[in-house]
Amino acid sequence: MTATSGALHTVLGAGPAGTSVALELARRGHAVRLIDRAGSGEALDGVERLAGDVGTVDGALAAIEGADVVYHCVNVAYHLQIDVMPGIQEAVLGAVARTGARLVVLDTLYPYGETRGEVMTEDTPWRAATAKGKMRAALDENYLAAHKEDRAQVALGRSADFVGPRVLNSTLGAAVFPAALTGGEVPALGDIDLEHSYSSILDVARGLAVLGENPSGDGRVWHLPTAPARTTREIFTALGDLVGHPLRTVMVDEPRPFGPFDETFMNSYAELFYQHTEPQIMNSSAFQRKFGLAPTPIETTLSQTLEWYRGFLSARAKD
């Protein structure tokens, strides 16, 4: 798709999602700014990196100056989310309400809460009972209300657990791929024989870019393209085939520190551990039908992720 003449796309948050979105938008020919508090990091072709703080309306206004479309990919550590994320929403919503920029929000599955294995679609009721799930549901209600009341133009894209290049803090991230490559121990969270959806971070980026290019998607929640759910054991087996040896899994059947998942993280994540004790199956067919964007096969995503981690570990070894 060709870029809209003169349109500026501004991405808030330079984690794996924000960085991937910025790169995807640049690949599509858009003018792109990537904003985080530091304004530094790896050089990205076609992306202008700037420092900004979206914790206040004034800060958010400065960050999105001149933007036609804003992508909210900001996240914070689990133990800070309940205190910090509502304020960021207030600031970002307030800023786009003043400027008229469209807002595309990266969202989670937390509002659904425990599903007892029910396939999650955009029509699944929001039954969150955890503090973080209720917080995310309240944020989403605010976004949709702002759109309905014509205070802002908003689209929400929900993702399952991330996997892919640059993804570290995920259950299929830095706890798994380095150990797979080196023969170390891989945590097997909960019941790995349950089906579990994982979203390629590159598909997340493509999906959010499509929402940014298509106002017809505004005013609702979408499930971003996600490959059919597989059991985590099947994914570990496929990963073992790619690295040439079976993974050395260690069962973690309750939330406790393991590897990169320290005590602070696990204590905060404990209320969401149900995601590993019941099937987590996300269906993205509505998005696929509407926008014609299919998810990447999980085997391809695993190969892409391994390639990135090989480079990541090699670069770290030289430091």
Which residue stretches match the model-derived regions?
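Amphipathic terminal alpha-helices
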Residues: 288, 297-319
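Conserved Rossmann-fold NAD(P)-dependent oxidoreductase catalytic core, especially the SDR/UDP-sugar
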Residues: 90-138
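Glycine/proline-rich active-site loop of Rossmann-fold NAD(P)-dependent oxidoreductases
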Residues: 164-175, 211-222, 245
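Terminal hydrophobic/aromatic helix or amphipathic segment near a protein terminus
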Residues: 234-281, 314-319
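NAD(P)-dependent short-chain dehydrogenase/reductase
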Residues: 149, 160-195, 239
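NAD(P)H-binding glycine-rich loop region in Rossmannoid oxidoreductase-like domains
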Residues: 40-41, 47-99
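Substrate-binding strand-loop-helix patch
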Residues: 195-202, 222-242, 296
